Amino acid sequence: MVSSGALAQSSSLACGELRTGYGPFDYRTDRNKLGIVEQYHFTPEVEELIRGKSSIHIGQDLSYTLTAFPNHHRALLSMMRYGEKLKTPQPPDVKYSVECYFERALRFRPDDAVARMMYASFLSKNARAPEAMRELEQVAKVAGDNFFTYYNMGLIYLDMKEYEKALTMAHKAMAMGFQKPELRDKLMAIGRWRAPEEPSSPVTRSGNDAATPSK
């Protein structure tokens, strides 16, 4: 049996060590470190895959951003879109494959539900539904009372044609007060929407019944 330590070592060999000259920092909590990276590397033009900032190569700026902040959610999304745009698992101007950047994010912060959902979406788009399902199961374990997480899980399940799971996630998000209609409308459009069941009321005896003496 392969140990978790051996798996981590194998992963780091394939997708690189996390230690770097600047970082690694957590995108969720180290916000005070973001400024320099987003000013000089992850600019709006880089995020939208228009042009590079520090060089002519968009991928170099994306790579730097995800080296300093492995779980930078917006940069992960841009990296995924970059691979899709060039129709390649590893664009020529980035250090690792697109999937490696998700692996690095989750190796760095396994509890990052957003990064894990994005990885599930990546797996789904690459026809790897069983793996995507496993990632979403992990997300559900840490979702807590975050209605936005359930809503986004529902959208991914919908893309995977897992309609009952998508419906369950929509109901959970609605029960928590989330009213954005997109997921519901998409389920309605394909005839898969059902309103949440109303909790059944306890059966009570009428006044007349209560007054009737037992025989």
Where are these regions (language model features)?
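Canonical tetratricopeptide repeat
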Residues: S78-R81, M118, N152, K186-L187
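Canonical positions in the second alpha-helix
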Residues: Y64-T65, R104-A105, Q138-V139, K172-A173
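Helix-start (N-cap) detector for alpha-helical repeat units in TPR-like alpha-solenoids
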Residues: H73-R74, A113-V114, F147-F148, P181-E182
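N-terminal leader/linker segments that initiate helical-solenoid repeat arrays
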Residues: L7-S63, A68
